[in-house]
Amino acid sequence: MAMSSFLINSNYVDPKFPPCEEYSQSDYLPSDHSPGYYAGGQRRESSFQPEAGFGRRSACTVQRYAACRDPGPPPPQPPPPPPPPPPGLSPRAPAQPPSGALLPEPGQRCEAISSSPPPPPCAQNPLHPSPSHSACKEPVVYPWMRKVHVSTVNPNYAGGEPKRSRTAYTRQQVLELEKEFHYNRYLTRRRRVEIAHALCLSERQIKIWFQNRRMKWKKDHKLPNTKIRSGGTAGSAGGPPGRPNGGPPAL
C-alpha cells in the first residue's frame, strides 16, 4: 500500500522501452511473448512476493544439490561399551585418603621404600620347616666329588685323594723322565724330589712312572719278574727225607 501511494504522489517518469523486435533480434528475450506482456510491468512490481519466489528456488536448489552430491564415507561407529564385570567381583574404587591426612612427598616416599629391610635370602616354608637350614648353606663337596686335573698338579701335592685319573704327561716331561731312566732305573728320595720340582709333577707321579717304566723294560728284555715267586721251586729242590731226588724209598 505504501508503494502504490509513493508511486502516485511522486513524479515518476515512465521509461521508454525499445520495441520488442529489437529484444528478440538481440536474444535478450524470447519472441513468443506479446507486447502486452511487458505493458503490465508496473502492476507486477506491486504484486511481487520475494519470499515465495525465494522459497521455491531454495527448495529446488536443495533437491538438485542433494541428487548430484556424491555420498561421502559413512560416519565412524562409536566404540562398544566395556564388558560388565563378573557377578562375583565388584569394581574397586581407588582408595581416597581421609580429609585430615597429609600425603607424603615423593622424596619421603622413596626414602621409606629404600629404608625397608630386604627379605631374607632363604625364607623357610612354614609347611615344611627345616631346622638345619640346609637350603641356605653351600653344598658339601666331598673328596670323591672333586675332579683332579693331573696335568697341572701342584708340586707341593702331598696326596690324600682316594681316586685319581690317568696322568697325561707332556712330551718334554716324558723326554726328561726317559733321560733319567737311561742312567738310573731306581731313584732315591732326594733325586725324586728334584725331578718332581723340575717337571712340575708330584713325587707320587714320578714314582708310578718309574715303576711302569721298569716293568716295560723287563718285558722288552724278557727278564723274569722278581715280584712273582713260584711255589714249586722250593719243592723240586729237595724232597722229603729218605727219598733222594724224589725217587722211591730205599728198601
UniProtKB/Swiss-Prot annotation:
SMART domains noted in UniProt:
HOX
GO MF annotation, one = DNA-binding transcription factor activity, RNA polymerase II-specific
Per the record, the major location class is nucleus
- Origin superkingdom: Eukaryota
Q: Which residues bind DNA?
A: 162-221
> Among its keywords, does the record have Lyase?
no
Tell me which GO cellular component terms the UniProt record holds: centrosome; nucleoplasm
Q: What protein is this chain from?
A: Homeobox protein Hox-B4
* Organism from which the protein derives: Bos taurus (Bovine)
